[in-house]
Amino acid sequence: MRHLRYIHDKNYSGFCIRKNSTALMKSGGLFSSAVDMYRKVDPGIKIKLKDQKIVFSSGATVSFSHYENDKAADLYHGLEMSGIFYDESSQASESHIWWLISRLRTKAKMSPSIWLSCNPDPSSFLRSWVDWWLYPETHPKFGLPDPEKNGKIRYILRKNGELFWGDTREELIEKFGNPR
């Protein structure tokens, strides 16, 4: 759905990714659901089944692909990806997510971003990414989302494989310097 924000920008190149493409392309999967939804917004979309891609009237695209193993990184090498949606990201490896993040760059008039969907899995690497938004261990509702933190944006810096979080981009720059 988020891709719809940018479909009027011919330079937008969105991606929907799952661990394997079977779940993406089966009837009732993400691709067929997206076609139904996108067609309501832009009846002139072109469906490129072979390429697993939807092309909007403006020229903006949303492609559907997989990231099943390390070799699949080659699918994204050299690409400029405006927006990435990774469905069921708890099935992904953390290194795959970071590789995709490294592909985020665009000529579209938007800030490139990635968004991840997942079901709760305390053994997933994502647990440490969402901990701040959850009630702490000392709270009776430990592990559940804290509604007071709903919608709050946090910033992440990865340095030498370690993650650092801040409430603002400036906070992280002040602590660690500007990475650019």
Please give the residue ranges for each predicted region:
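Phosphate/NTP-binding elements of NTP-utilizing enzymes
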Residues: 1-180
